[in-house]
Amino acid sequence: MLQRNFHIITFGCQMNTNDSFWLSCSLQKKGFQEVSLEDASIIIINTCSVREKPEQKVYSILGKIRHATKNNPDSFVVIAGCVAQQLGATFFEKFPQVRLVSGSDGIAMAPDAIERLYAEPDLKLNLTDFSEYYPEREYAFSKLTLSNNNTLALMAYVNIMQGCDNYCTYCIVPYTRGKQKSRSVQAIVEECQQLIDSGVKEIVLLGQNVNAYGLDKDKNSPANGVNFAMLVHTIASLPGLERLRFFSAHPKEFSSELIDLFGEFSTLCPRLHLPLQSGSDKILRRMGRKYSMDEYISIITKLKKVRPDIALSTDFIVGFPGETEEDFLQTLQSINTIKFMSSFSFCYSDRPGTRSSTFSNKVDHEVKIKRLEQLQATQLEHSTSWLKSRVGVETTVLLEKVSRKKAEDNNSWQGRDPWGNVVNVILPQSTNISNTLLPVRIIASKKHSLVAEPLII
């Protein structure tokens, strides 16, 4: 018998994570219960198409689901996200247990669609049409609680836009997320205020290219003339908000007005993720990134002038078609010059339908692997140095969850400092963790995290 319960499997970026969280909250408001994969009647796979062979990953998961749910023949599967947008009704043909395919814009309608599927066993639905404007969603966040897995809901993502108009030559996102569609200022600010009123301390603004907010090609954009710097100014000023971040930005639209806000608002965290992708101007042009290395460094220089303690992270693609050894060495030099606190780096792989998939001068796989290892080793040196430099610093940690390395006689909690570092804080057992933004002193650095002691108990 089909039960009113579900399980969500999520791949990919923070936007997918936020989509899955919203979907979970919405379904629970409708009376569905979130359960384990083995017990679920409805299995939702929120997919990503950015990395290599995404369809194969989804097909593999579907095979495992068939085995895991063999004792529940009435169960069905929902495919959501970017791979759903790409393949659409193909899933119905290959996998009979799939009854809903929901693309990027279809997520807003998915809870009602799942309700229908639960009531109509023979129904199948395809929600892969792009909408003209940002598909607004029902507010589904509940009051701040300490959940069963000892996690505090103190940080929340807020979508401010959908899609992208940049069309970098290697990127599938404009095809799977659609054209850029900014959300209305009023809806964004209202959601942020509702989250703050619910107990949220930190908000992360999300979009494929957040600093292009309001620059939609559609002149009737709901942004109504407001740009990203103006939006950040408004949200950073909201009473009760402790921390504000945004992800992901693009160097091309990084304005002086936005840079100045880092010096104006302590609420705006001293941490920025700004994808560089390559340190070679030649490769940046082939990627269609529309900025030079000098322009990127100029942004960093201005940021450090207004916020000297700012920490920077980035993305790199290694082995892009046409990348020579000299191009790669320029990328290594960019790491040594800017000293990123961390980076996400991957070997280039073709995405069908993108311009770069047709480029000649592909780099050999062995060369790509060797370069990636060299880049990651260089980055590790700077990441280690950054973490060591934090020892002795007094700061605040936003507690998130019980640490996996819980000491036997202590109450060990994990959280993040304003720079986004993972910090494990050892507290006496009797500590009341209601003081969730905790003043601490960093006492040690680990490979990927920090250890701190509380300054106030």
UniProtKB/Swiss-Prot annotation:
Its EC number is 2.8.4.3. Its cofactor is [4Fe-4S] cluster. The keyword Membrane does not apply. It catalyses: N(6)-dimethylallyladenosine(37) in tRNA + (sulfur carrier)-SH + AH2 + 2 S-adenosyl-L-methionine = 2-methylsulfanyl-N(6)-dimethylallyladenosine(37) in tRNA + (sulfur carrier)-H + 5'-deoxyadenosine + L-methionine + A + S-adenosyl-L-homocysteine + 2 H(+). Residues 388-456 form the TRAM domain. [4Fe-4S] cluster 2 binds at C164, C168, C171. CDD domains: Radical_SAM (cd01335). Keywords: 4Fe-4S, Cytoplasm, Iron, Iron-sulfur, Metal-binding, S-adenosyl-L-methionine, Transferase, tRNA processing. One of its GO terms (cellular component) is cytosol. [4Fe-4S] cluster 1 binds at C13, C48, C82. Catalyzes the methylthiolation of N6-(dimethylallyl)adenosine (i(6)A), leading to the formation of 2-methylthio-N6-(dimethylallyl)adenosine (ms(2)i(6)A) at position 37 in tRNAs that read codons beginning with uridine. This is tRNA-2-methylthio-N(6)-dimethylallyladenosine synthase.
